[in-house]
């Protein structure tokens, strides 16, 4: 059963990395980053259940990761909204805000 869960997690992780590398839209890149975080959470819960099912350390750690991912998504979407108000675009290749 562990192999199936790890295969699912690896598949989600690969989809997230592929989407993060190839996406030109910033909102889509944030969604792919969340997909990567969810793949990591699945791994944590699976290994926690496989190694020691009497303790819930992996589940608690994944709850912390979900909270951090929610904060990251909130901050990321706020930045995207601020950039969209200034530039009228969410394409990553059009952002040159740090150039002089």
Swiss-Prot record:
Pfam families: Oxidored_q2
The keyword Transport appears for this protein: yes
NCBIfam families: PRK05715.1-2, PRK05715.1-4, PRK05715.1-5
InterPro entries associated with the record: NADH_UbQ_OxRdtase_chain4L/K (IPR001133), NUOK/Mnh_C1-like (IPR039428)
EC number: 7.1.1.-
PANTHER family given in the database record: NADH-UBIQUINONE OXIDOREDUCTASE CHAIN 4L (PTHR11434:SF16), NADH-UBIQUINONE OXIDOREDUCTASE SUBUNIT ND4L (PTHR11434)
Record-level GO cellular component terms: chloroplast thylakoid membrane
TM spans (from-to): 1-21, 30-50, 63-83
Membrane topology: Multi-pass membrane protein
GO molecular function: oxidoreductase activity, acting on NAD(P)H, quinone or similar compound as acceptor; quinone binding
Subcellular location: Plastid, Chloroplast thylakoid membrane
Similarity annotation: Belongs to the complex I subunit 4L family.
Quaternary structure note: NDH is composed of at least 16 different subunits, 5 of which are encoded in the nucleus.
Chief localization: plastid
Species the sequence originates in: Marchantia polymorpha (Common liverwort)
Function (record text): NDH shuttles electrons from NAD(P)H:plastoquinone, via FMN and iron-sulfur (Fe-S) centers, to quinones in the photosynthetic chain and possibly in a chloroplast respiratory chain. The immediate electron acceptor for the enzyme in this species is believed to be plastoquinone. Couples the redox reaction to proton translocation, and thus conserves the redox energy in a proton gradient.
Biological process according to GO: ATP synthesis coupled electron transport; photosynthesis, light reaction
Keyword Cytoplasm applies: no
Keywords for the protein's UniProt record, in alphabetical order: Chloroplast, Membrane, NAD, NADP, Plastid, Plastoquinone, Quinone, Thylakoid, Translocase, Transmembrane, Transmembrane helix, Transport
Catalytic activity reported: a plastoquinone + NADH + (n+1) H(+)(in) = a plastoquinol + NAD(+) + n H(+)(out); a plastoquinone + NADPH + (n+1) H(+)(in) = a plastoquinol + NADP(+) + n H(+)(out)
Name of the protein this chain belongs to: NAD(P)H-quinone oxidoreductase subunit 4L, chloroplastic
Leading EC class: translocase
């Amino acid at each position: 059963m562990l192999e199936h869960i790890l295969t699912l997690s690896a598949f989600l992780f690969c989809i997230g990395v592929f989407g993060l590398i190839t996406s030109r839209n910033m909102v889509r890149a944030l969604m792919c980053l969340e997909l990567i975080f969810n793949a990591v959470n699945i791994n944590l819960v699976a290994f926690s259940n496989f190694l020691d099912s009497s303790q819930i350390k992996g589940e608690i750690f994944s709850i912390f990761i979900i909270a951090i991912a929610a904060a990251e998504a909130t901050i990321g979407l706020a930045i995207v909204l601020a950039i969209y108000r200034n530039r009228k675009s969410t394409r990553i290749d059009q952002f040159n805000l740090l150039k002089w």
